[in-house]
Amino acid sequence: GLGPWRAFLERRHKAENTEPLHIALVGKYDLQDAYKSIREALSQAGTYNDRKVSVDFVNSEKLTEENVAEALKGMAGVLIGPGFGERGISGKFVAIKYARTHDIPTFGICLGMQCIAIEFARNVLGYTDADSREMNEKTPHNVIDIMEEQKSITNMGGTMRLGAYECILQKGSKAYEAYGTEHIQERHRHRYEFNNQYKAEYEAAGMKCVGINPESDLVEIVEIPKLKWFVGTQFHPEYSSTVLNPHPLFVAFIKASVESFEEKEKAKK
């Protein structure tokens, strides 16, 4: 029936009257259309946290170490968007580093998750030339690698793996808290994967691989447990987020952003 819809609309109406919570969507200017479903998922998650969410686009191609503090000023959370190609990627690393070192809740999706892994390798593990094989075929530290089954397939977008894949979550992780269950299924396609040869080093330095595909041992979710909320997913949770069933990771991300922002505001007083 219409009951759930009515309840949602009422809740949304109330949320609309709250002080907007600013979330930075860091991405490439020409991908605005591709980010539509992310904007909607963030807005829905806001309603479920009884807050109005203002999604503020931050152009990664213009971000530098010098202007990042100004660009992310007043942001309660940072979402590192998906997207192909090298252009604008250095700006994503700048945003990730700033958010990580200032403990601003951060959510990286697909390429955004890969950027989270690369930034950590460069600035925490000390592999300054770490990269993805997609961006730099000759990188000595390919923390993101092309998938084994893809190596023989050269055409882009040919057979990126797509479909629902099982993923097992580590108990006690932020991802597990969000879903409230250990076994999840998510749909996605990608040609690049986290390089498991580096897994032990990442984990020792504080970034944990908390979502693993049991069949292929692929890392699907990474997070930094000691930060308030710093999570990256290989899959696209925005595609399965709906008005009546908002994706749990978006809801958890906004919840953490609200809590973190309010804490910071209190500290200022």
Feature map (PLM): residue ranges:
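N-terminal beta1-alpha1 cap of cysteine-dependent amidohydrolase-like domains
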Residues: G1-H183, H188-K228, Q234-K269
